[in-house]
Design a protein with these regions (language model features):
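Short, glycine-rich, amphipathic interfacial segments at transmembrane boundaries or analogous
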Residues: 41-96, 162-176
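Structured, soluble extracytoplasmic/luminal domains of envelope-associated proteins
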Residues: 95-127
Length: 212
C-alpha cells in the first residue's frame, strides 16, 4: 500500500533527524535528570499498547522520582492521588512525583524526544493515536463502555509521537474525547493529514496547552 510505504519513509527520515537532535542535547538533559533526583536517565514505566494491542517499551526521559508508577499504586500516602489519577483519564494536573527538572522537560515535551528511537524501530510513528497504558484502556473501557468501539479502531494504527490529541488540548481533554479523536484519525489517516498534524504540533508545543 502506497500510504504505508510513504508513511514509513517519512518516519525513518523524521526519526533520524530527531535522533541527531537528541544526540546533541542528550548529555545536558541526562546530567540535569540525574542532578534533579536519584534514579535512571530514562523513565522506568509500564509498557504501552501499540498497534493491534502489541505492547512495547516507550522511551522517555525520566521526569519523576524513581519508581514513581510503582509508588502511585502501592504507597498508602499516594492512595487518594491514585484514585484521582484514574478518575482524571490517567493524568494529574499537580503531581508531587514530578521533579523540578521534570516540570520543565514535560512542559516543553523534551521528555518525549527519545521516542524517535521507537519511531525508527517501527514501534511508533511520527503521527498516530496516543500510546495508552494497557491497564488504562481496560479500566477506562469499564468506566465508559461506549468507548470500546473507538479503542478497537485506534489500535489499528501505530501510536504516534504526535497526533490529534496533541494538537487538540493534550491532557485537557477527557478519555472519551481522546479515543474518539484517535479513532477518527485511524479511519481517515493519510500523508496529507499527517503533515497537517505535524504542522499544527508546532504551535501546540509553543503554547504548552495541556502539558503537565
Amino acid at each position: 500500500m502506497l500510504y504505508d510505504f510513504l508513511k514509513r519513509t517519512l518516519d525513518i527520515i523524521g526519526s533520524l533527524f530527531g535522533i541527531v537532535i537528541l544526540g546533541l542535547i542528550f548529555p545536558f538533559i541526562a546530567f540535569a535528570v540525574k542532578l534533579s533526583s536519584p534514579g535512571p536517565i530514562f523513565a522506568d514505566v509500564p509498557k504501552r499498547s501499540g498497534k493491534d494491542g502489541k505492547s512495547f517499551k516507550m522511551y522517555k526521559f525520566r521526569s519523576m522520582i524513581k519508581d514513581a508508577h510503582l509508588l502511585l499504586q502501592s504507597d498508602p500516602k499516594f492512595k487518594k492521588l491514585y484514585e484521582e489519577y484514574k478518575k482524571n483519564s490517567y493524568k494529574l494536573s499537580h503531581d508531587p512525583r514530578v521533579t523540578p527538572v521534570g516540570h520543565f522537560i514535560r512542559k516543553t515535551s523534551i521528555d518525549e524526544l527519545p521516542q524517535f528511537i521507537n519511531v525508527l524501530k517501527g514501534e511508533m510513528s511520527l503521527v498516530g493515536p496516543r500510546a495508552y497504558y494497557p491497564d488504562e484502556l481496560i479500566n477506562q473501557q469499564k468506566a465508559y463502555p461506549e468507548t470500546k468501539k473507538y479503542v478497537k479502531t485506534l489500535l489499528t494504527a501505530k501510536p504516534g509521537l504526535t497526533g490529534p490529541w496533541q494538537v487538540s488540548g493534550r491532557s485537557d481533554i477527557s478519555f472519551e474525547k481522546r479515543v474518539k479523536l484517535d479513532a477518527s484519525y485511524a479511519k481517515k489517516r493519510s500523508i496529507l493529514y499527517d503533515l497537517k498534524i505535524i504542522i499544527l504540533t508546532i504551535p501546540a508545543l509553543l503554547s504548552q496547552k495541556g502539558a503537565v
